[in-house]
From Swiss-Prot:
Gene Ontology cellular component terms for the protein in this record: plasma membrane
Name of the featured protein: Gonadotropin-releasing hormone II receptor
Main location: membrane
PROSITE patterns named among the record's database cross-references: G_PROTEIN_RECEP_F1_2
Topology term for the membrane: Multi-pass membrane protein
PANTHER family, per database record: GONADOTROPIN-RELEASING HORMONE II RECEPTOR-RELATED (PTHR24241:SF69), NEUROPEPTIDE RECEPTOR-RELATED G-PROTEIN COUPLED RECEPTOR (PTHR24241)
Function in brief: Receptor for gonadotropin releasing hormone II (GnRH II). This receptor mediates its action by association with G proteins that activate a phosphatidylinositol-calcium second messenger system.
BP GO annotations: cellular response to hormone stimulus; G protein-coupled receptor signaling pathway
Annotated family: Belongs to the G-protein coupled receptor 1 family.
Subcellular locations according to the entry: Cell membrane
The species this protein was found in: Macaca mulatta
Post-translational modification: Phosphorylated on the C-terminal cytoplasmic tail.
Glycosylation sites: N101
Amino acid sequence: MSAGNGTPWGSAAGEESWAASGVAVEGSELPTFSAAAKVRVGVTIVLFVSSAGGNLAVLWSVTRPQPSQLRPSPVRTLFAHLAAADLLVTFVVMPLDATWNITVQWLAEDIACRTLMFLKLMAMYSAAFLPVVIGLDRQAAVLNPLGSRSGVRKLLGAAWGLSFLLALPQLFLFHTVHRAGPVPFTQCVTKGSFKARWQETTYNLFTFRCLFLLPLTAMAICYSHIVLSVSSPQTRKGSHAPAGEFALCRSFDNCPRVRLWALRLALLILLTFILCWTPYYLLGLWYWFSPTMLTEVPPSLSHILFLFGLLNAPLDPLLYGAFTLGCQRGHQELSIDSSNEGSGRMLQQEIHALRQQEVQKTVTSRSAGETKDISITSI
């Protein structure tokens, strides 16, 4: 029996992190470290290295002081928090998954079981809530570009606070279960925490809504408002502004080209969220309503679907890198446009001055001629 046959997600790591994670121990046949699990561990290590390097680079990039800015840009602050959430996934979820697949059973103490399951779910919540905060901020930046952005810190605090509170039940639901017999076996599961199966299903569905449905719905509403606002006739009419309008920007983040790149980045984050987590949660829903699916789905497929979820953390730094390059290109074009506009204004001023000099010379010469004629007539 492979290490993945005992869990709804096909792994001893307990991908069903909000409920019955881990390998069930009721059966007579214990799980093993299968070939599919070995491949999964190898891929997880690759994702860990890429995610850790990328998100640490993003965190360093967005937190270092910018000499051209008096205060940090809201966009940089948001992606600093998103990088922190991805690092929490990287350093909690990925090592836990790889180690648990290798050891097959739980080798740590009960307190470690409860704490790690709490941190794992908190990491998943934060990685789901912070893209929502980014979507709300982009909506405010597009609909009210000159408005106050003081609410960003409150939204970030709410996202982290909810992640902490919603993950607290893990501390009480998870515990270690020991199996006596010829081969002792210990696992970190929720066995015995729910008196009836419907209670466990209700908890799973509640967490599914908070982790996937609510963030997806909130982001869809935000970007729908943005698309409707951008596509409205008034917005299109006002979009053809002269280059001098950039001088009215109160910060680099409020400039139209930066808002456009930030909006594109936020949309890409939404798409990666959907592509990475939809297969993961669909498999979970299937298991909750049809537990016999464990015998119908190959373990290799379950491994692949879970790795799709882990892929989200390494992708975010790549998207931020593309955003940074786009902003730098837009900033260079903005500088060129501003310099060209300044040169054009100087040329117009010089031409106007020359014309004024020519007019003044003409008037002076005419005045001198009239004075000479008057003198001759008098003689």
